[in-house]
């Protein structure tokens, strides 16, 4: 995750603050973090509690001659409740489809994602497989009109038929909570669709040119 701005103004990094952390805790800069027992830890992949913010520095948990804070007792966190942050849009690969459907590869979308979970999400064709006959141009934006849990079928307006291996970026509906559609990745640095999660994040913007989505916390530790 990359802190972008505070919605209520002020520099993101200038408003970052020190919080206690166990010396051995491993957190990467950009990770979504929370408080546990008064100390900073990684947010859970399917976090249901309040989020503190985004780690502003690396804390490797081991001694580092070039970074005396690497295993220190403090870590800086961008903690403004109005913090806007961004990450790369998650991607899926098509396994099959038609002029009006896209079926992601097995495992690219969690099988537990509910019916309609991706309705009104926007897909952007990022890459075509070598043998793809897809007639859509790279960069084509496709609105998902319906999502069926059975078969993980995404319905769309008539257009190019996806080839197996075609790659699409997925942009969740603006204003929608990510929970139930995606969860935080292993290091809490981005969003994955492979696992359904109750992440306390809300999508508030799309940046199609840079392939990024903008997010805010739904529940915050300081409010």
Where are these regions (language model features)?
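Surface-exposed, low-hydrophobicity beta-strand/loop segments enriched in small/polar/acidic residues
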Residues: 1-223
